[in-house]
Every structure is written in C-alpha cells, then in structure tokens.
Amino acid sequence: LRYEGGIGIQKMEAHSMEAKKIFAYVPELPAMFDALTVREHIEYVRKAYDSNITDQEVEAILTRFELEDKQDKLGNELSKGMMQKVSICCALCIKPQVILLDEPMVGLDPKAIKELKEVILELKENGVTILISTHMLEMVENIWDVMFVMEKGHIIGSYSKEEVGDKELDALFFELTGGEK
C-alpha cells in the first residue's frame, strides 16, 4: 500500500494497539484457519481484541447470520458465503468503532445481504464509522452517506448523499468517470 501522509483511526495512529482494538476489517476473500471451527474463530478474535462482547451477544450475531447450527464446522468445510458470514461475525464481535468492509456482499445469499444491510444501518445509528469498498453500487444504494470514486488507485471525486438527493449511484459514478449513463 502506497500513500502519502498519515493514517489515523479516531485520532489515533493507525498502527497503535488502541486503534487496532476499535477497528474491524472484513476482507473480500475471507481467510479461515482450516483446523478451527466457526466458534473457535469467534473466540480467537474475542481474545485477540480483548472484546467485552457477551456470550449472548455472540449468539445473537451468529443467529442473525444463520450460523448458530454451524458453530462446530471447520474452516475448511465452509463455502465462500459461509466464510464471509464468519468473517462478518468476527468483525462484529469486537464491537468496532470503525469497520472496513471490502466487497462484503460477494458470496452472500439474498437473506444474508439483507441482514448485513440492516446491521450496517444499526452500526451507523450507533455512531460507528463504516467504510465499504464495492463495485456493486446497487448493493449500497440505500445505505450510503458519502461516496468516493477511485480510478487507478486515486480518488477522482466524491459525493455526499445530501448534495445529490435521489440521484442513483451508478449515474454519479459514470458522471465522474465519463462512462455510459
């Protein structure tokens, strides 16, 4: 990753332990330990982040993403969609103040996509900063506040929902990139 300047998370140096404890990341390609179960992945993250999430809250997250009956499945037994759900649950289990989701809906079934959108709106209502990187603009149509458009690794423009009203995201994207409308 090449960049100029500094990166901060809630006014903390991004590499600091304090910043890492409030920051969650859901990668585009979830990485799972083959020999750990779904539950062990959750517990691993809870301990690594010294999370104060309760067992009841963990169960509620697993239930929302239909993983309660998959807790004993090993990482190497899961489909891409299931791994994505586990990755999302792990991120939520640290109770982040900032969360970065990279193509989070790829591989998810329609019900899980709907659930993730609801979770994102709940996080937003609770003051969590949410960053979503996606090429599937229609997936974030009803949940975005600010859109940055990148081209060749550089931000070429941005919009806020307040500025553009009901204009569709793909129209805004094409406006910036000069593509088809």
Explain the meaning of each model-derived region.
Residues E43, K47, I53-K70:
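Conserved ABC ATPase "signature" region
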Residues I99-E103:
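Catalytic Walker B motif of ABC-type/P-loop ATPase nucleotide-binding domains
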Residues V140-N142:
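A short, surface-exposed alpha-helical micro-motif characterized by mixed small hydrophobic
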Residues T134-H135:
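H-loop/switch region of ABC-family ATPase nucleotide-binding domains
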Residues K114-N126:
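Helical segment within the ABC ATPase nucleotide-binding domain
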Residues L74-G81:
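Conserved ABC ATPase signature
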